[in-house]
């Protein structure tokens, strides 16, 4: 009897976990279609640059409008800077806000970031008002900088 009760609880737990995952995916806003020829780039620093710990990063965008996250107009969005990210964030959820994913929801096109000495990678990821990546994602080339 105890085995049946444990199996029943395990089954209910697994079903609940699957339902929670399905609900989270269903709740994610749809991804906006990428405007034709939209690109983003890191204008400064250049790939391979040797920089101090306070790094001015300038963002570029072409064929898409940079706007605050409150602007929900089609074809607009804002930058996210990925710092030392191994891969892009999941496409079915908003870009997280943490030390690896910096949000620029006020429509900023540059920032000074502080990095510890060593090699670091930087990449831009452009998203809509809901912090969802476009479809397909609008990302810059990943660059590596050397911090003194």
Model-derived regions: residue spans:
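Classic N-terminal secretory signal peptides
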Residues: 7-12
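Long, low-complexity serine/threonine/glycine- and acidic-rich segments characteristic of extracellular
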Residues: 30-35, 48, 52-62, 70-148
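Periplasmic peptidoglycan-binding/anchoring modules of Gram-negative envelope and division proteins
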Residues: 65
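N-terminal signal peptide c-region/cleavage motif recognized by signal peptidases
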Residues: 15-17
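Proline-enriched interdomain boundary motifs that mark the N-terminal boundary
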Residues: 37-42
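Positively charged n-region of N-terminal signal peptides that target proteins for export
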Residues: 1-4
